């Protein structure tokens, strides 16, 4: 059966239900059975789209299919070619597709063939920062720090799995029952996590954290209310004065964004080595070496861990080592690097407070497999880490530095901290936004001497209350 015959067969139902919908409006009023007709109309439209999509793929030359699967391909040229094939298929079957649906059909076909199907427009929307797919019928986005449910849907689970396969195949991975979890990265740098049944009971789930091409600057973050000018000046002095900094916060709190801002203060004359699971940092300095971990292949071989990268980075004559996130035993190697001449290093950690960050570092060092006494671990942390910056995502979706604390040493077996700056919450205004003020504790940091040794003098009025 030709494409035209298949489309016309499907279109009979489409036209009949349109007429039925119009009749129901005339007979039963504005509501009638129009909703039912609209649903069948949409179902028929999706069936027609699927037929044309299958026809285009079948007719597409094999060499063009191979080019499409390559992330490095010229997307503008591919779009032009696929757009032409879509237009030809519609032109050859003009009675199957109503005129009003043709432009939408071409765009959706291009998204199906070149992009990620129905979620492609969400990925192109600059106001969307995260896309969360909880099965084929439930898709959420994060916009301006708030979660919103969309009316976007996949046709069915098979359609969603087809898009998932496209994502993981592009990075040489697979996802199936034997390997139901995958981390990947899109061509634009966005991070993707996939988990499928039997682990996910609600169906295949995809979480995409979009890669921002517009790097936030200090001025922008001050404008957004993430911190104030005094805190920015202090953090700039800390970076230029080669203090070791840990940025702490929960998931989605803006740790990597803040680390990127802090990294911008590193002098251009220094050699920086960045280590990440998924490359997100966008440093503007010239002398930057970016290293990325590698998961094991299908046979379970070839894995390169963060610990491997930290150890290798120490042999690369770095002036600064910046670890995107410490999660496990690499914390021990990072602390040793901080304690052995690599001052000015920075990393992030998942924790809800500065005190919790210290506990997390202890736990991560224990995960290295080294049987060290707890006091020795705490002593290592106290001598390596100078500043902990705590950032949080608040109820209104805003991200703020809620605390900057200095590690001052040890008293007995306890690592001591002192707060330097903090955010005082004043409540919620009539628009639902959290209000407050950034304040100083009035205490002058003990790291003043270390800063002075590196040519940085803190302004005397920086800590006046």
Features from the language model and the residues they span:
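N-terminal anchoring/assembly modules that precede and organize ATP-driven motor systems
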Residues: 1-148
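Active-site phosphate-binding and catalytic loops of NTP-dependent enzymes
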Residues: 65-66, 91-98, 114-125, 167-184, ...
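P-loop NTPase switch/communication element
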Residues: 212-223, 260, 264-311, 357-361
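Hydrophobic anchor at the beta1->P-loop junction of P-loop NTPases
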Residues: 247
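Conserved lysine of the Walker
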Residues: 255
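NTP-binding/hydrolysis catalytic cores, primarily Walker-type P-loop NTPases
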Residues: 397-465
């Amino acid at each position: 059966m030709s494409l035209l015959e298949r489309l016309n067969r499907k279109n009979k139902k489409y036209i009949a239900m349109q007429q039925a919908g119009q009749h129901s409006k005339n007979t039963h009023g504005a509501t009638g059975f129009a909703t039912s007709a609209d649903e069948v109309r949409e179902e028929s439209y999706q069936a027609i789209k699927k037929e044309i999509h299958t026809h285009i793929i079948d007719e597409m030359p094999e060499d063009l299919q191979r080019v499409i699967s390559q992330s490095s391909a010229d997307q503008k040229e591919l779009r032009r070619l696929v757009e032409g094939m879509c237009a030809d298929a519609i032109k050859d079957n003009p009675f199957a597709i109503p005129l009003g649906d043709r432009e939408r059909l071409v765009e959706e076909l291009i998204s199906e063939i070149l992009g990620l199907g129905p979620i492609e427009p969400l990925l192109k929307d600059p106001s969307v920062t995260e896309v969360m797919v909880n099965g084929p019928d439930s898709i959420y986005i994060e916009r301006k720090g708030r979660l919103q449910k969309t009316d976007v849907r996949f046709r069915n689970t098979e359609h969603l799995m087809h898009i998932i396969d496209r994502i993981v195949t592009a990075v040489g991975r697979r996802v199936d029952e034997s390997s139901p979890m995958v981390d990947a990265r899109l061509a634009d740098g966005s991070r993707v996590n996939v988990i499928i049944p039997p682990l996910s009971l609600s169906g295949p789930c995809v979480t995409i954290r979009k890669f921002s091409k517009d790097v936030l600057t200090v001025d922008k973050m001050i404008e957004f209310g993430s911190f104030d000018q005094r805190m920015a000046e202090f953090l700039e002095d800390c970076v230029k004065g080669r203090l070791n900094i840990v940025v702490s916060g929960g998931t989605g709190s803006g740790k990597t964004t803040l680390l990127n801002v802090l990294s911008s203060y590193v002098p251009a004359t220094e050699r920086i080595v960045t280590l990440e699971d998924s490359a997100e940092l966008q440093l503007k300095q010239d002398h930057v070496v970016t290293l990325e971990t590698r998961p094991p292949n299908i046979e379970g071989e070839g894995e390169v861990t963060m610990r491997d990268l930290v150890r290798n980075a120490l042999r690369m004559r770095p002036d600064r080592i910046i670890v995107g996130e410490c999660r496990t035993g690499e914390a021990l190697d990072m602390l040793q690097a901080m304690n052995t001449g690599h001052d000015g290093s920075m990393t992030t950690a998942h924790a809800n407070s500065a005190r919790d960050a210290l506990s997390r570092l202890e736990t991560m060092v224990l995960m290295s497999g080294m049987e060290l006494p707890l006091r020795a671990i705490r002593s290592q942390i106290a001598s390596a880490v100078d500043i902990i910056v705590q950032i949080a995502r608040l109820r209104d979706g805003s991200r703020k530095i809620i605390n900057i604390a200095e590690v001052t040493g040890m008293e007995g077996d306890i690592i001591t901290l002192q707060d330097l700056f903090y955010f005082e919450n004043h409540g919620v205004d009539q628009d639902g936004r959290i209000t407050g003020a950034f304040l100083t504790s009035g205490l002058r940091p003990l790291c003043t001497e270390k800063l002075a040794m590196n040519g940085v003098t803190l302004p005397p009025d920086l800590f006046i209350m």
